[in-house]
């Protein structure tokens, strides 16, 4: 049976860096760094989704980023603040802050400059199908684990178990990989992850409902944890 583990972060990053098309590289780079769903990145909605009232494109324009300075105690660091409109939450805005220094995150400056090139236009002016195609080409041969679960048929009250298995590595797997990295490498708590990745607080293990009043807190809460030299 296949090893039910995610690919190494370094393996995935190398694949992204060597993507053949520039827009593919930066699209996948943003999806990974932002812990984003595909619809939070892409700027166009396909005809099927429109007709069936499905996923709405919420992708950014080149104006959806700015630079700020983070200061606390002896720590002073420049950050690029990216605006992400959260899918499944009516486009609720969340801010993704990434260190500008390459020793903390070598992709931040590249992505920031790519945004600026697009001005008022959409940064990724294509549909999620194209994003999936880019992921399919870029991550060919990679897979990620799906834990066992139960399927429910409205015509059959008895749940049908589905065994743990592997799926081809695509855009949604980037979200899983980044979330795992934020927890295991950077020490994010469930609350930090809900603020960063746009999950509802009640969906995060270990985050009580009483914490919901603080969900508006911005990037300054989690940003110091990203100031960890890795590269």
What are these regions (language model features)?
Residues 6-38, 42:
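Basic, Lys/Arg- and aromatic-enriched nucleic-acid-binding interface segment
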Residues 9, 23-25, 132, 172-176:
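Short, leucine-enriched amphipathic alpha-helices that occur as contiguous helical runs
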Residues 9, 99-165:
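Active-site/catalytic core of tyrosine-dependent DNA strand-transfer enzymes
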Residues 19-20, 30, 163, 167, ...:
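Residue-level marker of regulatory loop/turn positions in helix-turn-helix DNA-binding domains and
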Residues 29, 33, 173-200:
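C-terminal catalytic core of tyrosine-transesterase DNA break-rejoin enzymes
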Residues 31-77, 190-195:
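Short, charged phosphate-coordinating catalytic segments
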Residues 62-126:
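Basic, alpha-helical nucleic-acid-contacting "clamp/cap" segments
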Residues 197-231:
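Catalytic-site neighborhood detector that most strongly recognizes the C-terminal catalytic loop/helix
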């Amino acid at each position: 049976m296949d090893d039910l583990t995610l690919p190494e972060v370094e393996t995935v990053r190398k694949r992204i860096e060597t993507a053949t098309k520039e827009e593919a590289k930066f699209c996948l780079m943003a999806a990974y760094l932002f812990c984003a769903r595909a619809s939070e990145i892409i700027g166009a909605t396909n005809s099927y989704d429109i007709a069936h009232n499905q996923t709405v494109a919420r992708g950014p324009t080149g104006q959806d980023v700015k630079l700020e300075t983070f200061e606390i105690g002896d720590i002073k660091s420049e950050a690029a603040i990216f605006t992400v409109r959260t899918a499944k939450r009516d486009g609720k805005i969340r801010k993704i802050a990434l260190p500008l220094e390459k020793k903390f995150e070598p992709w931040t400056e590249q992505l920031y400059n790519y945004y600026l090139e697009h001005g008022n236009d959409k940064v990724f002016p294509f549909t999620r199908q194209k994003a999936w195609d880019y992921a399919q080409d870029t991550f060919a041969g990679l897979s990620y684990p799906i834990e066992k679960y139960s399927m429910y048929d409205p015509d059959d009250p008895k749940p049908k178990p589905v065994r743990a298995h592997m799926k081809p590595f695509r855009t949604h797997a980037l979200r899983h990989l980044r979330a795992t990295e934020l927890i295991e490498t950077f020490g994010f708590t469930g609350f930090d992850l809900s603020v960063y990745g746009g999950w509802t607080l009640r969906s995060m293990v270990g985050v009580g409902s009483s914490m919901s009043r603080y969900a508006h807190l911005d990037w300054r809460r989690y940003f110091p944890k990203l100031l960890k030299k890795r590269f």
